[in-house]
């Protein structure tokens, strides 16, 4: 019975990941940030003319971005790597895996390793329905990096601290 429940939970996470992939695939490139990050960030913050063609372009762009706009250089480096070189399709695949992992990690954190189909379903519904601006934060290209990936890494870090941190 336990094996059957494990397989149902795994199948659920896989199904949600596939559905999330379809949503990402159907989400168009946004004309604001998604297009802007395909180019080397300009010093004047207006003339986006040089497309990202290499890692060197990304380093130059992120240096300017850091000086002109904000300090999210690590996340935006990865964003420009995908937006300029690797492409949206690979990002969609990785993001769907990360979304499934996010549901799993949140469930582990909340239920203390007693994952169940109910906890996965509840977390999924809460993410889809209660997250303000789910489309902007979890489906648009820039939002995937700024929110989904960073959120998952943060929860992974918290889980690591809980497991290996000093116990009082």
Residue ranges and their predicted role:
Residues 20-67, 79-80:
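Extracytoplasmic loop-helix module adjacent to an early transmembrane segment
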Residues 72, 119-162:
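Membrane-interface micro-motifs in multi-pass membrane enzymes
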């Amino acid at each position: 019975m336990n094996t059957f429940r494990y397989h149902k939970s795994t199948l659920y996470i896989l199904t949600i990941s596939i559905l999330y992939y379809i949503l990402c695939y159907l989400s168009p490139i946004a004309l604001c940030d998604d297009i802007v990050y395909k180019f080397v960030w300009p010093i004047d913050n207006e003339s986006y003319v040089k497309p990202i063609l290499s890692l060197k372009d990304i380093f130059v762009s992120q240096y300017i971005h850091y000086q002109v706009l904000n300090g999210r250089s690590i996340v935006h480096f990865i964003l420009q790597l995908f937006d300029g070189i690797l492409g949206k399709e690979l990002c969609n695949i990785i993001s769907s895996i990360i979304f499934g992992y996010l549901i799993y990690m949140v469930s582990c954190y909340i239920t203390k390793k007693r994952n169940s189909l109910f906890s996965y379903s509840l977390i999924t519904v809460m993410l889809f329905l209660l997250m303000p601006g789910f489309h902007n934060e979890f489906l648009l290209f820039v939002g995937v990096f700024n929110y989904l990936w960073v959120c998952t890494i943060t929860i992974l870090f918290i889980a690591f601290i809980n497991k290996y941190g000093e116990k009082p």
